[in-house]
């Protein structure tokens, strides 16, 4: 890496092809990317890949995004901990809360975001328009759930400074109103996902036509007993929904189920962590908003009261290689599922391409996957001490 003025040159191995590349970066973007011919030193080069993009971060490194007491210092710790784990872009995720609390809390998050323009690129509102059914609600509070509300949409967009980038809803709770809500949200600049839902294939298709792009953490928030042929998993697979996210921690979706779903979905899969405060932290008791979560020594995050899963402790960089381990498919395909594809949902040009923002990871694969450095908009923001 040779910095010069506001420019630098990096030599690294392309994560897809393994070929040695010379990459020139100026003013935070890739200026020139070219193959290095006949390089005898390329095996010593680090691998280079676009930074990871996580659409669902509830917390990280001991910090809860949903905490009323979230400070600017804590928010910066969370952002930098995510840098350390390969994440150059993420959505701070707000779970279901009282309707009248969204405006004030999003104003606060927007202020934090403006003061610390790091890797948080906006907000994901997971709720309050979710299914109250026992199998689908997860740890979200039923009493705070409601039908889609267009006036609420205007309020949260204004309060967030337009930074609500993803909203997860269950369209079956009011089909007609949900379709109207999806159209309006998309028009205002937010992507829409379906999740915590029992939507049928027909309703999913209607939502797709209206603009829905994603199913949020498929396989999670699902009743343990479903009809043999008419169930959410088959309906999502058979639908035209462009993407479905999966949590590759082996706890939310066991290995065999993960293999089956990813084979069926193919390139429609994206990876998310659904990380909560206990991620990149010690076992113990944490909070996800109002919910008390116990993280056990194996890293499983469980709601203390109900015993249900309450987010994950997955680190994004590890998620790529856990997905590879569970499926046996090439790791670089999972890297795309955790970087380029989620960026597409948000309309962000991402990837190793001239003119794109130079936000990337440098890492080794042997003897184990290991993140060396992370760059954000051409600036080194993390360097391993090892």
Mark where each language-model region is.
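Divalent metal-binding pocket/active-site signature
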Residues: 125-127, 132-231
